[in-house]
Amino acid sequence: MVRLRTGAVNTMSKRLILSVDPGKASGICLFEYEKGYEPKLIWSGEYQQNEYAQPIRNAFVSYVQYGMPIDIVCERFTINAQTVRNSQAPYSLEQIGILKQIMLDHKIDPDTIIFQSPADAKAMFSNEKLKKLGFWHKGGEGHALDAIRHAVLRLAKIGWIPTKLLD
């Protein structure tokens, strides 16, 4: 089970950010954010197809348990000439479908998923910047880092200023 930090929770100002980089191997992470404070990376990981749904379900358990608003961010998957040739192409679409079903199971409209382009996330938050921010995931093939990238891009879009990058 995903556990958030202990203590009283002010559900009016705190929110969760669940971020997914879907694919054959998927990156998933969960952040907690309160305006005026640094975001906290609760967990991150890389998951194979048979493992993919459980961490998402766990994040939704935390969402229900703590009553915090949740933003669900997902890398946009666009079918183009390259992805048609790529044998892994259907995996991303299938994983997005699983994410949408889990949202429906928790009475969350899947149309509220915030899709972001991989190029935007990588342009804004390089590996060097993720390290400087302290949001580095060790191990894996980089999918967890891509999920983290999408989460911090979302955080920046809702008002978080990554001041550690200004030093």
Regions found by a protein language model. Name each.
Residues 2-167:
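Phosphate- and other anionic-substrate recognition elements at nucleic-acid/protein interfaces
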